């Protein structure tokens, strides 16, 4: 057998089998849209559940006065103006429970507004 054949056969086989292995498909990342209503003196829904890794779009409205949408641990602090929608997007990277509060200080009832975001495994 010639040296060209000894070189050519392994080279051809290497390229032929290189395309046979397929990487497993990347896990599907979910994307969720959730409407949230802030009103005298409540946040609805009271609990929002999402899966770890999800791209979460919150569409927050208020039916009365200005509120603040604050989530400890997720670095979210957004004003929510009357009769407008505030869009908040975040990636749910870390499992756990996160408290949602109204960020308006000093107004009657604002400090009683609370909900929870739960990021599940």
What are these language model-derived features?
Residues 55-61:
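Short edge beta-strand/loop segments characteristic of extracellular beta-sandwich folds
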Residues 20-23, 80-121:
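Extracellular/periplasmic metallocenter environments
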Residues 27-53:
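N-terminal edge beta-strand
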Residues 62-66:
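Short proline/glycine-enriched turn/loop motifs at strand-loop junctions of beta-rich domains
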Residues 46-48, 75-79, 89:
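Beta-strand-rich interaction surfaces with strong enrichment in secreted/lumenal proteins
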Residues 1-18:
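Sec-dependent bacterial lipoprotein signal peptides
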């Amino acid at each position: 057998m010639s040296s060209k054949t000894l070189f050519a056969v392994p080279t051809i086989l290497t390229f032929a089998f290189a395309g046979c292995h397929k990487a497993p498909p990347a896990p599907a990342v979910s994307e969720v849209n959730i409407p949230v209503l802030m009103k005298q003196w409540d946040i609805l829904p009271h609990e929002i559940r999402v899966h770890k890794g999800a791209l979460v779009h919150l569409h927050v409205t208020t039916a009365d006065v200005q509120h603040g949408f604050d989530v400890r641990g997720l670095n979210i602090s957004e004003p929510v103006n009357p009769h407008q929608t505030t869009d908040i997007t975040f990636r749910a990277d870390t499992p756990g429970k996160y408290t949602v509060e109204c960020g308006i200080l000093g107004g009657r009832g604002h400090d009683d507004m609370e909900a929870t975001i739960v990021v599940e495994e």
